[in-house]
């Protein structure tokens, strides 16, 4: 594990790149550039290969532009990985690549920068957008959303079991005072949450749910997985690191469907051998080592899964 570009520590760096790079002269995609940790190691492994990076975050794009100037094999695009197909064609001039990498969720620099509005530990404007120039901020959403829809978002995307109680408290507070900062919201949630998990801030799940909704993270993930699989050459691999159960469930389900086909009723005279299966999963899910978790506690929930195209 290597500390790269400021304070961000890339999770399962060697494990993921070992799985990803199968051809040193191939074409690769990093769907989540961040601060370039995985990108730089991929470039180190490549000879004449090329790499295309994606990120929504303008700060990440700034780092990517610097790397573009350093290494002609690398290009960066400010967009969601869900839209990778058109950019692959535009940049590489082909529609198939040798590998796609996704390191999901919010990065350490985003969490630690109070001005971005992701943190419930440091006070800042309640924003939470990966790209602050697009879409509705968390503060704008909280000011207008119905109590029911707010509770549904925290429950579905944050798995917050006290979502209704928390949403009620937020709506009561906003009726007399605008909610504009992260600590303002965090305090309301903490006071409404009757059962704090040991070692976890009471606002963790609610903040996660709001952030995922504001950025359409799960919608982008579902589209991006499909786009990545379609973009792979035979022998090409999709490597995905997820950080919470909602993401991992989507990734696991998608890869299982691609590798095994749909679940069929037992009485049907059709078996997997009769299906046109184009992919296989590579090994079992990989989790960070104990030493990595000791060095970087944010890696503790990470899961790496890999899918490989075996035929057209």
UniProtKB/Swiss-Prot annotation:
InterPro entries: RsmH, SAM-dep_MeTrfase_MraW_recog, SAM-dependent_MTases_sf. Belongs to the methyltransferase superfamily. RsmH family. Its EC number is 2.1.1.199. Its main location: cytoplasm. Signal peptide: none annotated. It comes from Marinomonas sp. (strain MWYL1). S-adenosyl-L-methionine binds at residues 36-38, 55, 81, 103, 110. Keywords: Cytoplasm, Methyltransferase, rRNA processing, S-adenosyl-L-methionine, Transferase. Specifically methylates the N4 position of cytidine in position 1402 (C1402) of 16S rRNA. It catalyses: cytidine(1402) in 16S rRNA + S-adenosyl-L-methionine = N(4)-methylcytidine(1402) in 16S rRNA + S-adenosyl-L-homocysteine + H(+). Pfam families: Methyltransf_5 (PF01795). It is an enzyme of class 2 (transferase). The lineage of its organism: Bacteria, Pseudomonadati, Pseudomonadota, Gammaproteobacteria, Oceanospirillales. One of its GO terms (cellular component) is cytoplasm. It is found in: Cytoplasm. GO terms for biological process: rRNA base methylation. GO terms for molecular function: rRNA (cytosine-N4-)-methyltransferase activity. NCBIfam families: 16S rRNA (cytosine(1402)-N(4))-methyltransferase RsmH (TIGR00006). This is Ribosomal RNA small subunit methyltransferase H.
